């Protein structure tokens, strides 16, 4: 049910301008989904949706369609709100988050499209960041740790 609902959310935001979670919940209900505001909020977070403005309207966009600057801004916000430690060994950068936040933070890292990062694997509160080369590990660790300091 959750996967079907989230696919429907992506379909909806591609078809029409949705500016608020309340609006999205209303459209989902009309489509036959019994949702609460909390459910929609979790879905928005898990899908990595971000609000974007074209100067006249504000709407939700899926991560792949977000401008890189917006993806970077989202990542900074998520790091400040949910990450409490960044560490590394010789091959991986490890990011520790509050419980339940790793998936969203990892998604933000993926969509920021840093060229040194191959990808991420997230559990509940831990993210493994795969870096292109060993020589990049220290730099990525420092850059991510810097996001915590603001």
From Swiss-Prot:
Which SUPFAM superfamilies does the record match to this protein?
C-terminal domain of arginine repressor, Winged helix' DNA-binding domain
- Any one of the GO BP annotations: regulation of arginine biosynthetic process
Q: Does the keyword Translocase apply?
A: no
| Name of the protein described by the UniProt record | Arginine repressor
Which biological pathway?
Answer: Amino-acid biosynthesis; L-arginine biosynthesis [regulation]
What GO molecular function annotations does the UniProt record carry, in alphabetical order? arginine binding; DNA binding; DNA-binding transcription factor activity
UniProt family annotation: Belongs to the ArgR family.
Q: Coiled-coil region(s) at which residues? A: none
Coarsely, its chief localization is cytoplasm
Recorded name of the encoding gene: argR
């Amino acid at each position: 049910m959750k996967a079907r609902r989230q696919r429907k959310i992506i379909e909806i935001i591609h078809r029409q301008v949705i500016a608020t979670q309340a609006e999205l919940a209303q459209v989902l209900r009309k489509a036959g989904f019994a949702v609460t505001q909390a459910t929609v909020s979790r879905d928005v977070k898990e899908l990595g949706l971000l609000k974007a403005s074209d100067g006249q309207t504000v709407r939700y966009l899926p991560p792949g369609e977000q401008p890189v600057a917006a993806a970077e801004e989202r990542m900074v916000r998520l790091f400040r709100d949910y990450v409490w430690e960044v560490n590394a060994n010789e091959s991986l950068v490890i990011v520790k988050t509050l419980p339940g936040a790793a998936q969203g933070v990892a998604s933000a890292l993926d969509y920021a499209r840093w060229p040194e990062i191959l990808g991420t694997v997230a559990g509940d509160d831990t993210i493994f960041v795969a870096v292109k080369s060993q020589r990049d590990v220290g730099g990525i660790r420092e850059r991510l740790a810097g996001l915590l300091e603001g």
